[in-house]
């Protein structure tokens, strides 16, 4: 494989890739509001000469290149989280800016930059006759990943394959274009969302001892979650310290897999509460 030719082709496409990425950044595309950006992606894929460009029932945009019974899939989720308080941004998140080193704006890294790389990467493969024989390249711009991770590919599997087993038999492997600082990561342990509910007894805030404050009870859980993520090996307990998953003493069956993937992480991402009023103990 001529890596110099690949680099030269990428350099030649750089202005077009930059424009494509900045166009995507300029289109607000929070989860469930991706219509504008998926249409822009479809336009680019068609202009690049993809054999087929289509949308599935959920709204994912899919570009196909090459011929064959086996598939190599490249996924980029193209929805973003919100911008929060725009005053906290150093530049308009939907205009952004570019320097010799970065392209700044909402979604530039997570993950519309990956979409630009995937779209042009497969185009370069076609230009240089690097498409593998017997394989189709499946380039996916997936939606609603930020809010409901996995639903986008569940839709694809159900619509284009006869269930998960059929998908596994036809898709040779999947490349995720999540940002990695240019590293190649060969595995992922997956993701889990856990909801924890705490209930208390409300009372007037002037006499909190008469109630049972659900916020205080939840605070203990939140601190334990923090400790679970942050405790070093020598500070781990039977509960706290995810680093223990790497130790055969505590994880004899799966520690080798854990070492390959690296230790897991966890965090608290949302808190909700109910209370009759701001002067009452939360229940």
Model segments located where?
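Acidic/His- and Gly-rich active-site-bordering loop/insert found
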Residues: 2-104, 108, 127-135
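Short glycine-/acidic-enriched loop or helix-start segments at secondary-structure transitions
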Residues: 36, 83-85, 149-151, 185-186
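Conserved beta-strand termini and adjacent loop/short-helix elements that scaffold enzyme active sites
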Residues: 55-58, 142, 271
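Alpha-helical metal-binding/catalytic segments enriched in His/Glu/Asp
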Residues: 74, 97-150, 194-198, 209-229
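Acidic, glycine-rich active-site loops and adjacent beta-strand->loop/helix elements
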Residues: 78-80, 140-155, 177-182, 202
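A glycine- and small-aliphatic-rich helix-loop capping segment at beta-alpha/alpha-beta transitions
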Residues: 87-95, 152-165, 190-194
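Midchain, well-structured core segments that form catalytic/ion-binding scaffolds
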Residues: 160-283
């Amino acid at each position: 494989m001529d890596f110099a030719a690949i680099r030269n082709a990428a350099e030649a496409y750089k202005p077009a890739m930059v424009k494509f990425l900045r166009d995507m950044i300029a289109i607000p595309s929070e989860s469930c509001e991706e219509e504008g950006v998926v249409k822009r992606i479809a336009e680019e894929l068609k202009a690049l000469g993809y054999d087929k460009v289509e949308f599935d029932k959920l709204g994912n945009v899919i570009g196909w290149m090459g011929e064959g019974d086996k598939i190599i899939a490249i996924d980029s989720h193209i929805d973003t989280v919100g911008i929060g308080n725009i005053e906290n941004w150093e530049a308009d998140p939907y205009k952004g800016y570019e320097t010799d080193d970065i392209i700044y704006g909402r979604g530039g890294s997570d993950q519309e930059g990956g979409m630009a790389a995937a779209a042009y990467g497969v185009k370069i493969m076609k230009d240089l006759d690097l498409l593998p024989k017997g394989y189709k390249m499946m380039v996916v711009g997936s939606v609603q990943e930020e809010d409901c991770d996995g639903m986008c590919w569940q839709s694809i599997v159900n619509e284009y394959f006869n269930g998960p087993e059929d998908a596994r038999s036809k898709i040779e492997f999947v490349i995720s274009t999540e940002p990695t600082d240019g590293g190649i990561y060969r595995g992922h342990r997956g993701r889990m969302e856990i909801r924890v509910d705490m209930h208390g007894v409300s009372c007037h805030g002037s006499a909190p001892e008469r109630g049972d404050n659900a916020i205080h009870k939840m605070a203990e859980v939140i601190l334990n979650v923090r400790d679970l993520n942050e405790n070093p090996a020598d500070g781990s307990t039977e509960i706290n310290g995810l680093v223990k998953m790497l130790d055969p003493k505590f994880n004899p069956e799966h520690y080798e897999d854990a070492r390959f993937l690296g230790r897991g992480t966890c965090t608290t991402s949302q808190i909700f509460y109910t209370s009759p009023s701001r002067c009452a103990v939360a229940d």
